Amino acid sequence: MEEFQGYLELDIFRQHDFLYPLIFREYSYALGHGHGLNRYMLLENIGYDNKSSLLIVKRLITTMYQQNYLIISANDSKQNPFFGYNKNLHSKILSEGFAIIVEIPFYLRLISSLEGAEIVRFYNLRSIHSIFPFLEEKFPHLNYSADILIPYPAHLEILVQTLRYRVKDASYLHLLRFFLHEYSNCNSLIITNKSISIFSKSNPRFFLFLYNSYICEYESIFLFLRNQSSHLRLTSSGVLFERLCLYRKIEHFAEVFANDFPVIPCFLKDPFMHYVRYQGKSILASKDTPLLMNKWKSYLVNLWQCHFDVWSHAASIRINQLSKHSLDFLSYFSSVRRNPAVVRNQMLENSFLLNNAPNKLDTIVPIIPLIGSLAKAKFCNAVGHPISKLTRADLSDFEIINRFLHICRNLSHYYSGSSKKKNMYRIKYILRLSCVKTLARKHKSTARAFLKRVDSEFFQEFFTEEGGFISLIFPRASFALRRLYSGRVWYLDIIFINGLSNHE
């Protein structure tokens, strides 16, 4: 974005956030399409030459304002040469242009907030596994959790009103409002969960921007409530939870809270309330009794219903005890398990035994969802029996083995923090036997006959466990390292969830 800051002539629009003229700049849409506007628009639109023109963008906007367009049927679109290429093409082009333009003020505010601020970068914290050492320390002290699905607003005006706090250009907001309403009327989008999924796939950048704006507005109010009801101030990053003019809006918030939340009980002083947002869900965890969790659940439901006009039912939010229920987080089933231990104490001539049972974080591999992912990828059937996988005929045996080996190592690497290794052994067994059946199918043989025919060293690397590698490298310290390997190991080089592990 830095390289286009001067190109977009942002100095002219910085003072008043005047974004409307940028809609008629062709390079705005080129940026939105990743410099592929000509290829995308002209290949599907028969009748235009190989040069994009500003008239195309103007015609798209003009067409939106035509009254007869709202009643164009599918048959009319086939007869109309302008709509003959793709009936959603103009909406997709404008949505991506809207997204790249409306991100400009947010980017400038982010840059201004970072100026003069010395932020230490810890690259190891980019790893997904870096959150689990924190959970090992905090999670055993928590008792209850609530897994809440964040509802998405069905009314389009809520999305526009959310942007009003940040974007000051009235002309741009009017065009954005008209575009959203026109798009929903013609395609019935942003009304149901299915339509939201379609909208997110057809306009990913625009959908993510609207969704993040809504989530940011919701979390700003929720975190404000949390700070006001807690003895301890919230520890968070200013960049992650950056809010525009938050303290200027405190007076307005006070009026909203007075209407929507008549009473905030003084006993809601919980320094152990933890909040996490993960894949469209809010996770609340607390140390206190279920009464506090029920109070916060009611506040969230009232916040969505009264402030965002989003329907959410309190009965759909379940509060679970962590010692009895697992929490699905980052493709692990995490729970609190009591770890009983007997300690023998000696005091002078007297000795006695102490029973100590501290809580411990228990992380388990989600075996059933993982087998479902393997079955979807054609490594096994629905019950977990390995099957041969279709491969290209020109692949050599070593290339096939390396592909299976790469998948097996990635899964083993990601689930190295599991408390129980038996589930991971079953996943490795499925992948190994699937590899053997794939090779046997390629050579038109059975798995047993193929294993007898090949050399034993052929699968040596594939069938060697990670613990075997450690014992080969460090034979004298193999006992200690094997004990370390049998425990949880968190790696600091994992920056994304494996595709097979991401079963959400």
From Swiss-Prot:
Pfam families per record: Intron_maturas2, MatK_N
Q: Which GO terms describe its molecular function?
A: RNA binding
InterPro entries per record: Domain_X (IPR024937), Maturase_MatK (IPR002866), Maturase_MatK_N (IPR024942)
Q: Among its keywords, does the record have tRNA processing?
A: yes
Q: Does the keyword RNA-binding feature in the UniProt annotation?
A: yes
The record's comment on protein family reads: Belongs to the intron maturase 2 family. MatK subfamily.
According to UniProt, the name of this protein is: Maturase K
The species this protein belongs to is Quercus petraea
